[in-house]
């Protein structure tokens, strides 16, 4: 029997693998390494959110987890195209809009981690960090 191997870059495989109990420590390592959130907090408090909501006409978000005051969206981007940044910003905005109704004092931070299967920036770093924030 011939089997086809579906790559980890496939959205459904990406979500299935990273949300599996077998990969939980790996996911915790990724999130902690990128965000600085303590692994112990992630291990104790991380919950998976049903992320099967549509964010744009074709796409569902890949993997969404909540940890205390944070909502973290993990996205696999297979190819670069002109509107990719807009699409990723739309994901953040949708997650933020889902938090409406929470007290503004308690509204959770949304963090998006993109796994890009391309090198758009001609940069050898494994992690390139972009932030929308005020340093003051």
Protein language model features and the residues they cover:
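Elongated, amphipathic alpha-helical interaction scaffolds
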Residues: 1-136
């Amino acid at each position: 029997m011939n089997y086809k191997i579906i790559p980890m870059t496939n959205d459904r495989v990406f979500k299935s693998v990273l949300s599996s109990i077998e990969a939980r420590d790996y996911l915790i390592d990724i999130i902690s390494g990128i965000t600085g959130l303590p692994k112990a907090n992630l291990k104790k408090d991380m919950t998976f959110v049903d992320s099967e909501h549509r964010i744009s006409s074709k796409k569902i978000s890949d993997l969404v987890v909540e940890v205390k005051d944070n909502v973290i969206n993990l996205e696999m981007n297979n190819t670069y195209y002109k509107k990719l940044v807009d699409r990723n910003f739309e994901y953040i905005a949708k997650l933020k809009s889902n938090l409406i109704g929470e007290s503004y004092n308690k509204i959770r931070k949304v963090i998006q981690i993109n796994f890009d299967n391309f090198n758009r920036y001609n940069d050898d770093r494994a992690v390139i960090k972009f932030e929308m924030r005020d340093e003051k």
